[in-house]
Amino acid sequence: MARVAVLVAGAVLAFLLAATNVTAKRWTVGDNKFWNPNINYTIWAQDKHFYLDDWLYFVYERNQYNVIEVNETNYISCNPNNPIANWSRGAGRDLVHLNVTRHYYLISGNGGGCYGGMKLAVLVEKPPPPPAAAPNKNSARRTFSVSGFAYQFLIPVAVFAAVGTRY
């Protein structure tokens, strides 16, 4: 029974230490206009912040366009040759996982789409740190953190449960 308590305490500790407040966002490229020609995707992206583990969701006419990743030079010249990645999966509903902090250069290499404006460049950044909690002037000076909780409660419980099994 005590071993179960140790396992439960360990599982709770692992869960609390792994929990984060950061969530990835799925961006529909072009919003309700989707991935189509004659849309300025530079303007669409200019007021957005793309963070690590966000997703770009491309919706387009599958028989006419595609989504490929190219280098900056090929992005500028709308050259689809030698792509870094082809994100098209054939259904016209493609996701690009922004899993590295860097520039991503995406174009449509089919149907002259890139020349019609179907090109998107985004810079992926690390997420900002969570905001610091404002101090409460009306209460005693107490702070709560996952690590403080772990050291003050979960670890003693786990130690007690482990020692309790020997006696």
Swiss-Prot record:
Keywords: Cell membrane, Disulfide bond, Glycoprotein, GPI-anchor, Lipoprotein, Membrane, Signal. Residues 25-126 form the Phytocyanin domain. It is a lipid-anchor; GPI-anchor. It holds the Pfam family Cu_bind_like. GO terms for molecular function: electron transfer activity. Coiled coil: none annotated. Residues 1-24 form the signal peptide. Its main location: membrane. Residues 139-167 form a propeptide. Belongs to the early nodulin-like (ENODL) family. PANTHER family: BLUE COPPER PROTEIN (PTHR33021), EARLY NODULIN-LIKE PROTEIN 16 (PTHR33021:SF534). May act as a carbohydrate transporter. This is Early nodulin-like protein 16. It comes from Arabidopsis thaliana.
